[in-house]
């Protein structure tokens, strides 16, 4: 009979916080796409790329990727057709933590609370989003051998 040993690491929640940021930018419709007649649907996804901790602050870097479906009308034809446009907005935000989390394991969940894409004119859109960041810090207690 063989005895197998494993290390079990125990982590405890040290601090968590919630912060909301607003992202706002204008984008031009590429020349290869038709003019915007009517925006049908917009959707987006936010992800964090990195979380760096410096004492009681977490520097969160990430990006918001968005897409929209609109009815486009080209100048050379009377026909309207659906067109998809995508883009992304990068962000870097410093979030205050509730304690000194230097050396701890920190993760950050991000979610979109609101996404609004409006046509400024037929060749330009305005993208506004409210993003919620939830950095969570875990401290390493010990390793058990079983």
What do the predicted segments below correspond to?
Residues 5-7, 15-19, 25-33, 42-57, ...:
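Beta-strand elements of well-folded, non-transmembrane domains
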Residues 139-146:
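Conserved small/polar residues in nucleotide/adenosyl-binding loops
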Residues 81-110:
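Solvent-exposed beta-strand/loop surfaces of large extracellular or lumenal domains
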């Amino acid at each position: 009979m063989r005895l197998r040993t494993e290390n079990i690491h125990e982590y405890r929640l040290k601090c968590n916080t919630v912060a909301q940021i607003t992202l706002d930018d204008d984008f031009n419709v590429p020349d290869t796409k038709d003019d915007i007649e009517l925006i049908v649907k917009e959707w987006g996804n936010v992800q964090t790329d990195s979380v760096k901790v410096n004492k009681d602050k977490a520097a969160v870097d990430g990006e918001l990727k968005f897409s929209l479906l609109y009815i486009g009308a080209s100048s050379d034809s009377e026909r309207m057709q659906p067109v998809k446009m995508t883009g992304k907005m990068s962000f870097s935000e410093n979030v205050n933590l509730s304690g000194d989390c230097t050396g701890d394991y920190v993760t950050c969940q991000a979610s979109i609370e609101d996404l609004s894409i409006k046509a400024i004119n037929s060749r330009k859109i305005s993208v506004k989003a409210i993003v919620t960041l939830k950095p969570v810090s875990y401290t390493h207690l010990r390793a058990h051998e079983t």
